[in-house]
């Protein structure tokens, strides 16, 4: 059995932790750092195959020293492409070599006629009106903004019809087929963390949200040990205290503080409560800077130009990076617009979440980063942010898609939103002359502003596309219909287009943003 003094960085051993059921478990963890406070050693551990947000400092009493694995000496191997620091390519980010070599793209059906009928008792289904935070990111932008973005390729789970192939849709008895069955070719994580989006997401005919104890998302964003560790202990923002999930590049002198104090209106940071109180006597903001372009009830959205409000935008990015691991933070906020969602009370407009987007996007991205702050998660705000981004796309007359890669929680939220939105369209179709209703992929995309590729991938994800008697059909099972109705009953927050006061700008004609 090893001694406590023998534990070094890189060691792996079981560590005691409490799971979501308040039960003890001993997952394997890696020691990332060791520190000594008043003669007492603390160890910063990362639980293997769990999300980094669960990393923590522990004492030696929680370590199983009997099963310790010491780090092996690394063999000298040539680096990738001869470049120091190169990492193995990620299968989630790289395009298959065969596709690159041939210069071909995956076939995407554009004009598919979808025909279907619903059970008689469901022909007239009242439209449900009515979601939690989301954790995806800001001027947090992907690592390669100016270079060509890598494409995330997902193998189709069901046959993809050609561009002109007709499709019909039939209902199925709920007992005949469950909503979504895992099939070869569909990437599906068995253990994913799910605290960001709505709990009701699992009820719309798609798999239940991942468990609370972590995900299989790999720590590939940063190689150096500093950025793999949380550096801020606690953040006080208004009436909330937040425990950061990830590293954020706040000034080094602030990382030793027990609490970092932020002004909830301008997001400036201070070392102490006294500093914050002095700042509040001078800060005259009671809402985010910029124009209020939406208000309904207590919910408002403010549009903020990253060039005109640089300080606020940078502070927003620093805060968001505490809860986003898959983006790189840049301080050049000029090319971005930020849309901040707030909740109003007698003291002012309190930030709930936000999303950012490029002023000019050649890839039709309508969201660069998106986040709902932890205190407001699981309350429907995640889908509200997503819905608002697509509402802006409708006004702009464009289809849009979120920038890749999405976080695990962001992907959950978008999958749920796409599924509910598309099912809402399909179930609202009325038959003409006794024939089954018909709709094309293009029409769905135009109605919802969801990009065609996302429409197709969602239909595949829900396992709705089938081949029947020489044509492609959409099959809505009883489980899908029932699950969708239950989900829509829980979705109380919706965007009202009548409350949106937004005029899109043509940034291509403005030279410098």
UniProtKB/Swiss-Prot annotation:
It holds the Pfam family Tudor-knot. There is a cross-link at residues 430, 451 (Glycyl lysine isopeptide (Lys-Gly) (interchain with G-Cter in SUMO1)). Disruption phenotype: Embryonic lethality before implantation. Conditional deletion leads to rapid hematopoietic stem cell loss in both fetal and adult stages. Conditional deletion at postnatal day 15 leads to impaired spermatid development: testes are smaller and show defects in the transition from the transition from round to elongating spermatids. Defects in spermatid development is probably caused by impaired acetylation of histones that affects histone replacement. One of its GO terms (cellular component) is nucleosome. The modification N6-acetyllysine is found at residues 52, 104, 120, 148, 150, 187, 189, 327. Keywords: Acetylation, Activator, Acyltransferase, Centromere, Chromatin regulator, Chromosome, Cytoplasm, Cytoskeleton, DNA damage, DNA repair, Growth regulation, Immunity, Innate immunity, Isopeptide bond, Kinetochore, Metal-binding, Nucleus, Phosphoprotein, Transcription, Transcription regulation, Transferase, Ubl conjugation, Zinc, Zinc-finger. Belongs to the MYST (SAS/MOZ) family. This is Histone acetyltransferase KAT5. Acyltransferase and acetyltransferase activities are activated by phosphorylation and autoacetylation. Autoacetylation activates the histone acetyltransferase activity. Residues 227-504 form the MYST-type HAT domain. The gene is Kat5. Acetyl-CoA binds at residues 370-372, 377-383, 407, 416. There is a cross-link at residue 430 (Glycyl lysine isopeptide (Lys-Gly) (interchain with G-Cter in SUMO2)). InterPro entries: Acyl_CoA_acyltransferase, Chromo-like_dom_sf, Chromo/chromo_shadow_dom, HAT_MYST-type, MYST_HAT, Tudor-knot, WH-like_DNA-bd_sf, Zf-MYST. Its EC number is 2.3.1.48, 2.3.1.-. It comes from Mus musculus.
